[in-house]
Amino acid sequence: MQKRMGEAVARVARKVNDTVENKTDSLDLANCKLMTFPVGIYKAMRSVTEGIHHISLANNELKSITSRFVTTFSQLRELNLAGNYLHHLPEEITSLLHLRAINLSRNRFRRFPEPLATVPALETIDLEENEITEVPTEKLASMASLRSLNLRDNPVGPDVRLLVRPLVPFDLLLSPEKPTPEA
């Protein structure tokens, strides 16, 4: 058990070091079994955080994203948080003025994360395979940059199915309606 943990820590350290040394614009910590975003990464990456535009934390065991994470990586354009245990986002997500795409599929959201509705550059929101029943339709309709909202495999209410062009200027992806069983 300790050996596997040590290997996981070493893998994360290697990925962070590669990003810092090569001054790349992305950090890929997908599939690292992270339960939280390691605090040590903030210090290790402080010289390059402004240049990080893409972060993948997909397929970990994250239960939350902190406001510190959002404010540290303020220049993000793409954020992949798919396959975690997230059920809400910090309000500070609204400060990500350059964020164009966020993948929150396969998480634990029961409601649409409303702070996303005020992220100005957001074009793509993927919330496939969550537990979302409520969607702030009016707020979504006013999102000028939004091009695609994926709500497939969510138990959304019938009002969401009424969101069609030209009422909303984006593509809304939903699972087909299940036929109602006949009595």
Predicted region positions:
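The feature captures the LRR N-terminal capping module
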Residues: M1-A82, H88-E91, A101, E114, ...
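Solenoidal tandem-repeat scaffolds enriched in leucines and small polar residues
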Residues: E123, L127-T133, R147, D153
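Extended, charged alpha-helical interaction scaffolds
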Residues: N103-R110, L116-T118, L122-N130
